[in-house]
């Protein structure tokens, strides 16, 4: 008798191969918490895409929209967005074609930010005054992973200092979290002078960002993965993990839904269409971790 996770019955859930999803979920359940790790994007994956019909800000947007950025800088950043975002999500261009454009976009944006005399002490205030929100169910998600010793690797092309501060202000920044992102580099007098390490953009979230390898080496028994993303570029986030046995890829389809649905369904095992919650992920975690929890299961 196949057991079904009831959260997968949600209207927002799309699956190209439900049978295959069932097999992967079964394997994850047999492995339990001891074998599991979660690898996730942040912006528009753990954070909300929209609330009450209004777009929510990404970690870059939070800074772009803040009062510590000059009007001229904001205008230039907006122009960059209107030029490059359509390229980022264009279904007719290959990732290889998009790559140089993404590097240009991030590099230009970071260069503009470095001209703004941004101070480290301003970050918490900027986040506190923003409209950033984590997805509904975030507390259950973060707390469940922490309580069950499941590592959460957040791989973000956003701004590490900002997203870390969001998680801290939401009071779910637990010790099981490891973040790789674009972290700000401040001068001795506390002003932003650049960004540390290799630039991370939408389409190089893979093992080429070499600082991940030692992290994954420590987790060699964590051979089962739940991967969460909202772009095609997020699909490579687990590429640096050695010895993967089972991986369940869950994609949030937030924007340009009609034109991107087929591509997402071909790429992700589970697609969540315009779903601003973590209900499905939390339901799966319950099913995997709490073997006796039959409330979440429906016999077929």
UniProtKB/Swiss-Prot annotation:
EC annotation from Swiss-Prot or TrEMBL: 3.1.3.91, 3.1.3.5
Substrates-to-products reaction catalysed: N(7)-methyl-GMP + H2O = N(7)-methylguanosine + phosphate; CMP + H2O = cytidine + phosphate; a ribonucleoside 5'-phosphate + H2O = a ribonucleoside + phosphate
Any one GO cellular component localisation term in the record: cytoplasm
Family annotation (InterPro entries): HAD-like_sf, HAD_sf, Pyrimidine_nucleotidase_eu
Main location: cytoplasm
SUPFAM superfamilies: HAD-like
Domain of life the protein comes from: Eukaryota
Positions with a binding annotation for CMP: 88
UniProt keyword list: Acetylation, Cytoplasm, Hydrolase, Magnesium, Metal-binding, Nucleotide metabolism, Nucleotide-binding
Top enzyme class: hydrolase
Any one GO MF annotation of this record: 5'-nucleotidase activity
Quaternary structure note: Monomer.
Task performed by this protein: Specifically hydrolyzes 7-methylguanosine monophosphate (m(7)GMP) to 7-methylguanosine and inorganic phosphate. The specific activity for m(7)GMP may protect cells against undesired salvage of m(7)GMP and its incorporation into nucleic acids. Also has weak activity for CMP. UMP and purine nucleotides are poor substrates.
This protein's name: 7-methylguanosine phosphate-specific 5'-nucleotidase
Gene (UniProt): Nt5c3b
């Amino acid at each position: 008798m196949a057991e079904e996770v009831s959260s997968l019955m949600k209207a927002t859930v799309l699956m190209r191969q439900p049978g295959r999803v069932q097999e992967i979920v079964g394997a994850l359940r047999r492995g339990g918490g001891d074998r599991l790790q979660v690898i996730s994007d942040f912006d528009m994956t753990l954070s909300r895409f929209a609330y009450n019909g209004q777009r929510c800000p990404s970690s870059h947007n939070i800074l772009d929209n803040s009062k510590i950025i000059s009007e001229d800088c904001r205008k230039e950043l907006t122009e960059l967005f209107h030029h490059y975002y359509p390229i980022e999500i264009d279904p007719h261009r290959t990732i290889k074609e998009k790559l140089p454009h993404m590097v240009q976009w991030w590099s230009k944006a970071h260069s503009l930010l470095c001209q703004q005399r941004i101070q480290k002490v301003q970050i918490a205030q900027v986040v506190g005054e923003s409209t950033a929100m984590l997805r509904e169910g975030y507390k259950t998600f973060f707390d469940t992973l922490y309580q069950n010793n499941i590592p959460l690797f957040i791989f973000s092309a956003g701004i590490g200092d900002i997203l870390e501060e969001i998680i801290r202000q939401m009071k779910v920044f637990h010790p099981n979290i490891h973040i790789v992102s674009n972290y700000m580099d401040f001068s001795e007098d506390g002003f932003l002078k650049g960004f540390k390490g290799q630039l991370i953009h939408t389409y190089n979230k893979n093992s080429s960002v070499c600082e991940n390898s030692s992290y994954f080496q420590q987790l060699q028994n964590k051979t089962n993965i739940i991967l969460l993303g909202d772009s095609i570029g997020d699909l490579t986030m687990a590429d640096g993990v050695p010895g993967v046995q089972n991986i369940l890829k869950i994609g949030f389809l937030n924007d340009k839904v009609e034109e991107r649905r087929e591509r997402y369904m071909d790429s992700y095992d589970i697609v969540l269409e315009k779903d601003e919650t973590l209900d499905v992920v939390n339901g799966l975690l319950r099913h995997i971790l709490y073997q006796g929890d039959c409330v979440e299961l429906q016999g077929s």
